[in-house]
């Protein structure tokens, strides 16, 4: 009996190690071709410039879903659970990613103009300049604070609701055509964890500085960097889930 238990545990251990390796290789496979093939990277930049919303859908759909799979691995020991729903999550993340791109455009354009309205000279010019200056840093920080204070809580709550809706529909694509019972989903949120950890801690301690760096990058690189942060988001959500329990 003891031997059987040991064998089963060993098989599970090596199975998880194998899936961890495959997950890491999948991440490398996504980015390595762009590093090895300059022509492919140039095509990506051109397509991204011409079809920014399409690329936002793809970047967030792939990378943020992988981030949630990593979070699932941390919280449950597996990358996918029966109700996880990879395909519906990818589609929902793609739509959310387009919303994030829209928010980044709105706040990166509007916040510097508001700062000039409030008396800061040349905020728009400083933010648009290629060279790094302290003024550019302050504007980038202001953009990040504005976006994450106004937009992020609504986005995070909607994301929480869509996750619960997908799980309630067994992780199937049916979730995409089934109306969301918003009041029920909203009431079911663990607000102790949502406010006490997700809003109160991750926004000021992680997202403010992370998106400050994002807004210091050239405009064409911001959405990709934000999508990469989706992997970090998956880890943070996993920690939030553990705290909620």
Please state what every model-predicted region is:
Residues 111-138, 169-181:
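Membrane-interface interhelical connector segments
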Residues 206-214:
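Hydrophobic, membrane-inserted alpha-helices
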